[in-house]
Amino acid sequence: MQRSLSPHDQRLALTPGTTFAVHYADSSTARALLSDPARWTLGVVGYGAERPNFMPSTCPFVAAPLLPATGEAMFEIWISTLPTRPCRIGPVSGACNDELVFGAIRLEDVADIALEDAVEKSYLAIFDFLEQTGLVEPIRFWNYLTAITADERGVERYRRFNIGRHRAFSARLRAPIPPVASGVGGHWGTSVIYFLAARDAAKPIENPRQVNAYEYPPIYGPSSPRFSRASIYSSTLTRTLFIAGTASIVGHETRHVGDLAGQITETTENLRALIRAADQEEACSRDDRWALKVYLRDQAYREPVETALHGMFGTACEPLYLRGDICRSDLLIEIEAVRQTIAG
């Protein structure tokens, strides 16, 4: 029996002119979403799952190297109310409508190629993909690396990743401020990058409690992490706030090392700071819908995090809990968010 969708989710997904929405779904809900003739699909990300047999052959799919905290296969589904068409250019595949494109690439993460070279090559392929689709403004990146904090020939893999991303962005990124991104470590499968891009750029938002990540001091590596803390993307009828992976960092330093409760409190304070900064640009409304992705170093952390998020967001959020390594070994949790507000 197919699981039904909430009236609010249906309204957001199907309002004429609304470009896109994201849903985190188990297998039964994913089947319902993907079989609905009133929706088109931009892309699907699987967690703890390979491509399901109920997915249309033309639907872009990427298997992420992260596992759901529940142990049950989960799917991240980007749907569109505008017709989509599949597109594949070189190693990058995805789908687009007239305003937005979803794409994904598997990293060539092998022993005989330096990670920074593989990352640079992948990002340059992404920029080639965007140029050919005509949707040239990247608005959100997700970078999922296996063994993200492991040492690789004397240099942490995440630092090598940042070197490669920095090279590609220096060569091809049009905007002076980099887009929102997350970087999280996985434990199985293949390292992947997936992304959203649009015809029009998003407006960057920074956190007054933190140093901009792209301005971090060199103690974090020879190349700073090139991402913004948040941004607002405006489409026809929807305002979308993207919040990057957010953790217990103040200034540029980790706070509450080894203290889960302290890190939860600091992380939610950073989320509140970003929401306040965004609301100075775009007022929220009672129709706001939140989709949260929570990365847990240990799945036992889920219950206290869930309690904190329920206190902060109530029933207005759709959370997905994933087992993943944060890009600093002293961070226990990381939370990212998408808020969609129907304008008018």
Language-model features: locations:
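N-terminal presequence-like segments and the immediate start of the first folded domain
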Residues: M1-G344
